[in-house]
A protein has these predicted regions:
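Hydrophobic/aromatic residues within well-ordered alpha-helical segments
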Residues: 1, 112-115, 252-255
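N-terminal (or domain-start) structured segment
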Residues: 1-60, 100, 112, 124-153, ...
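Structural signature of the Rossmann-like NAD(P)-dependent dehydrogenase/reductase core
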Residues: 13, 38, 105, 167-172
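Hinge/capping helix and adjacent helix->loop/strand transition within the periplasmic-binding protein
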Residues: 28-34, 41, 49-137, 186, ...
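C-terminal lobe and pocket-closing loops
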Residues: 85, 157-226, 254-257
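An extracytoplasmic/periplasmic, membrane-proximal ligand-sensing/linker region
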Residues: 121-125, 162, 187-188, 210-272
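Conserved small/polar residues in nucleotide/adenosyl-binding loops
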Residues: 274-280
Length: 284
């Protein structure tokens, strides 16, 4: 994008609070296109649903969508000793044994926790959530058999799946993945509501002129066609998008509504950032 725009783009990492600190600062930046931020499912959907009392920005009202940079697949996988060998048998086994099996995710009220709860809602099954501090420990325990089921981003689980230490049941991805022959996506398996990959994209503060937004989007599209960028994304298990501001705004709103629905219907208790200093007014 720097080459296409003819000026450098400086990355300033503002970590903490699941991305809330950086997002809050970006939302209050000047509306001139010179301060942008990265949108993720966490910052735009999960945080507002899970942390409604102290989130200092509104993901729908405070930002202008520019474009979705890339999508990454999610996966539900099992320990190889799990009695079912395919997705249909997997769901049948869970329905026959409510509460017997446990699933791991990268943490309470994270994207993958909500994916697991959404799975339970869609399939009418009852599995027990075991939260971990990151995907690494969850993957390790799924491989070791401490938990039977894992909801994860595909790139972090793929090495263990390819090694035969985990068995993929289904993926959240628009099409089949060659390296996972015979593994359906959730839409093919009959649950399109679960067929949601994670994404990350570009945002500007709300009120940024559309000619500026479109210029940024055009530069992103050119960058996403660069073979080096495509390879870098592929190496991390992602695929480029580059959709329009309107299309990306629709994706954000759909994911926002999904997270709100899951948290409400599954009675997931809000978590708090009270130990962190967040800028200005809370999200309402």
């Amino acid at each position: 994008m720097s080459q296409e725009l003819g000026q450098p783009m400086v990355v300033e990492n503002k970590g903490g609070a699941g991305g809330a600190i950086g997002a809050a600062e970006a939302a209050r930046a000047d509306k001139d296109g010179y301060t942008l931020s990265i949108a993720t499912v966490s910052t735009m959907a999960v945080n507002p649903a899970c942390r409604p009392n102290d989130l200092p920005y509104d993901p729908i009202k405070d930002f202008q969508a520019v474009t979705n940079f890339a999508n990454t697949a999610n996966v539900v996988a099992v320990n190889p000793k799990f009695p079912a060998k395919d997705f249909k048998g997997f769901v049948e086994e869970l329905k026959k044994n409510p509460g017997k099996y446990s699933y791991g995710s990268s943490g309470t009220c994270g994207v993958l926790h909500l994916m697991g709860e959404s799975f339970k809602m869609a399939t009418g099954t009852d599995i027990v959530h075991v939260p971990y501090k990151g995907s690494g420990p969850a993957v390790a325990d799924a491989v070791g058999g401490q938990i039977e089921i894992l909801f994860d981003n595909l790139p972090s689980s793929m090495p263990q799946i390819q090694a035969g230490k985990l068995r993929a049941m289904a993926i959240a991805w628009p099409e089949d993945i060659a390296a996972l022959k015979g593994v359906p996506n959730f839409k093919e398996a009959g649950f399109p509501v679960l067929n949601q990959p994670v994404w990350y994209g570009l945002l500007a503060p709300k009120g940024t002129p559309m000619e500026v937004v479109n210029k940024l989007r055009d530069a992103a599209v050119v960058a996403l066609k660069d073979p080096k960028v495509i390879k870098a994304l592929d190496d991390q298990g992602s695929a480029p998008s580059g959709n329009t501001p309107e299309e990306f705004a629709k994706e954000i709103k759909e994911q926002f509504d999904w997270a709100q629905d899951v948290v409400k219907k599954q009675n997931i208790k809000p978590v708090s950032y009270t130990h962190l200093t967040l800028p200005t007014t809370p999200y309402v």
